[in-house]
From Swiss-Prot:
HAMAP family: Ribosomal_bL35 (MF_00514). GO terms for molecular function: structural constituent of ribosome. Belongs to the bacterial ribosomal protein bL35 family. This is Large ribosomal subunit protein bL35. Keywords: Ribonucleoprotein, Ribosomal protein.
Length: 65
């Protein structure tokens, strides 16, 4: 069976925590920021854990991470 390829776009966007959970950044923090409140921009900075419904898809795209 051939080797599986890692999805490079996703590999650049996701990190794995020490406990094995997948971490990602929130969307919406790159431009058009003047219309967003200070609180909203502050909350967009945070790193979040990938939702359990998406973990299966992430594992399929990142077979060796």
């Amino acid at each position: 069976m051939p080797k599986l390829k890692t999805h490079r776009g996703l590999a650049k966007r996701i990190k794995i925590s020490g406990s094995g959970k997948y971490l990602r950044k929130k969307a919406g923090k790159s431009h058009l920021l003047s219309g967003k409140s200070r609180k909203r921009k502050r909350n967009l900075k945070k790193t979040v854990i990938v939702d359990s419904t998406n973990v299966k898809a992430v594992k399929k795209l990142l077979p060796y991470l």
